[in-house]
Amino acid sequence: MAAPRISFSPSDILFGVLDRLFKDNATGKVLASRVAVVILLFMMAIVWYRGDSFFEYYKQSKYETYSEIIEKERNARFESVALEQLQIVHISSEADFSAVYSFRPKNLNYFVDIIAYEGKLPSTISEKSLGGYPVDKTMDEYTVHLNGRHYYSNSKFAFLPTKKPTPEINYMYSCPYFNLDNIYAGTITMYWYRNDHISNDRLESICSQAARILGRAK
């Protein structure tokens, strides 16, 4: 005849352990050590019961931290490349003011920031407010850039972070750059306060080269 099978539920085991630990009414350090054992057992039980969830949460948090680090490094590298290319553009174009604009959030383009500039800021722009300007996607410059074409004007300056007229600007020339997702990500723009500037063919060559390099870094 087979022996009867005895089963224990988790609650039976728990109360059995508690009974063993506290049945002698111990006090002081002995009691404290036993309470510590109970807490440890409780934590081990939670880890055992929900181990997969804890491990998944740990992996997710590590991945998010790693992604944030990579994103910060990429942004820092892009800003360095942007400044380097802008210096070349500014000198080669003989512009009075040049800027690299970057859109955010990534691939959505709701706001625009000046992330680097060379030359003298227009009188209507403050160095303290170079970022967070809303993007008007109906403007000619934006729609022209979406098609990969360069833009120039002597009266419309879509991305300058100001609503005030800027009469000292007589001419501007800009070209778009596209990120690694092939999404319009920002512009390189040159401005002149005087009437004379080098030919658009030359500006196209200067701007296109910088835009390709920025696109690979973005």
UniProtKB/Swiss-Prot annotation:
The gene is T. GO terms for cellular component: host cell plasma membrane; membrane. It is found in: Host cell inner membrane. The lineage of its organism: Viruses, Duplodnaviria, Heunggongvirae, Uroviricota, Caudoviricetes. Homomultimer. Heterotetramer composed of 2 holin and 2 antiholin. The holin-antiholin complex binds dsDNA. Interacts (via C-terminus) with antiholin (via C-terminus); this interaction blocks the holin homomultimerization and delays host cell lysis. Interacts (via N-terminus) with the lysis inhibition accessory protein rIII; this interaction stabilizes the holin-antiholin complex thereby resulting in a robust block of the hole formation. Its main location: host cell. Disulfide bond is required for functionality. Belongs to the T4likevirus holin family. Accumulates harmlessly in the cytoplasmic membrane until it reaches a critical concentration that triggers the formation of micron-scale pores (holes) causing host cell membrane disruption and endolysin escape into the periplasmic space. Determines the precise timing of host cell lysis. Regulated by specific antiholins that somehow sense superinfections and then delay lysis. Participates with the endolysin and spanin proteins in the sequential events which lead to the programmed host cell lysis releasing the mature viral particles from the host cell. GO terms for molecular function: pore-forming activity. Residues 1-34 are cytoplasmic. The chain crosses the membrane at residues 35-49. GO terms for biological process: viral release from host cell by cytolysis. This is Holin. The keyword Ribonucleoprotein does not apply. Disulfide bonds join C175-C207.
